[in-house]
Amino acid sequence: MKVVLASPRGFCAGVNRAINIVEKTIQVYGTPIYVRHELVHNDYVVTQLSKKGVIFIERLNEVPNGSVLIFSAHGVSKKIQEQSKIKNLIIIDATCPLVTKVHKEVSRANRNDMEVILIGHSGHPEVEGTMGQYISVNSRQKIYLVESQADAWSVQVNQPNHLFFVTQTTLSIDDTAEIIAILNKRFPNIMGPRKNDICYATFNRQNALKNLAPMVEMIFVVGSITSSNSVRLMELGRRIGKITYLISHANDIQKNWLRGVNNIGITAGASAPDILVLQVIEKLRVLSTDHVVVEEMIGEEENIFFDTPKI
């Protein structure tokens, strides 16, 4: 059996930065420290940090006054920021800089009295945080969430000639392009960011999967079901026509999946550590009746690094 590893895969600069922030915060303040929402959407990462004394919460009333609170890589709304100040919390912001970029775009459009369309998935914490950057001062100023092409065709805005769009950073490149095309057709004067809001890591991992697909019969995407970019990779693999499984850890693999399969591709979402990929390879060695040969495809080299704030 041949196993081909997608490149790039796994951790992005924003995830590395968020984890480094938590590690440094533990060194400076000790434990417990609190993180609003999962720092990143990966069960393994959350479990490892929990073992070190990190407490993950969803509501601010779970955090004692004066405690250390870290905002997750997905970002938070302005309302959450203000509520945190009232509780006299020590706030450390691990929001990915590329998410912060989108927040600034929304705030700028808001200040310029523009309405905003956010392309994203309802309920995702990044979307909640981005929606929460917009403050409506009257009934004609709103931010709208568009999740699909159908939404793009049906959304009704108050100011079609004074409109700006942004996107969640972890969307399907192809789906988002189709939605933007519809918005441009419906609202010829709509404006958007000068640089794509979909982050480099999402873009690179989806392109890597497209390049990987012709080499293999089956694809494993290593990542959690709550990880937007991991789910998008799974959907992309299936859209291309490959049998594709999203697995959070090696034990998810079933032996009958491998019957008659000689070439398997592996990729990993931007919040999945490489140790999980290594565990998947070892699991395949155990389950396969053949010798397993591992190859890594040539892909886009990533050397992006985000500085961590002073703790």
Swiss-Prot record:
InterPro entries: LytB/IspH. The keyword Cytoplasm does not apply. GO terms for biological process: dimethylallyl diphosphate biosynthetic process; isopentenyl diphosphate biosynthetic process, methylerythritol 4-phosphate pathway; terpenoid biosynthetic process. Dimethylallyl diphosphate binds at residues 41, 74, 124, 227-229, 271. Binds 1 [4Fe-4S] cluster per subunit. Isopentenyl diphosphate binds at residues 41, 74, 124, 227-229, 271. The active site is at 126 (proton donor). The keyword Transmembrane helix does not apply. [4Fe-4S] cluster binds at residues 12, 96, 199. Keywords: 4Fe-4S, Iron, Iron-sulfur, Isoprene biosynthesis, Metal-binding, Oxidoreductase. Pathway: Isoprenoid biosynthesis; dimethylallyl diphosphate biosynthesis; dimethylallyl diphosphate from (2E)-4-hydroxy-3-methylbutenyl diphosphate: step 1/1; Isoprenoid biosynthesis; isopentenyl diphosphate biosynthesis via DXP pathway; isopentenyl diphosphate from 1-deoxy-D-xylulose 5-phosphate: step 6/6. Its EC number is 1.17.7.4. It catalyses: isopentenyl diphosphate + 2 oxidized [2Fe-2S]-[ferredoxin] + H2O = (2E)-4-hydroxy-3-methylbut-2-enyl diphosphate + 2 reduced [2Fe-2S]-[ferredoxin] + 2 H(+); dimethylallyl diphosphate + 2 oxidized [2Fe-2S]-[ferredoxin] + H2O = (2E)-4-hydroxy-3-methylbut-2-enyl diphosphate + 2 reduced [2Fe-2S]-[ferredoxin] + 2 H(+). Belongs to the IspH family. NCBIfam families: ispH_lytB (TIGR00216), PRK01045.1-2 (NF002188), PRK01045.1-4 (NF002190). HAMAP family: IspH. This is 4-hydroxy-3-methylbut-2-enyl diphosphate reductase. It comes from Blochmanniella pennsylvanica (strain BPEN). The gene is ispH.
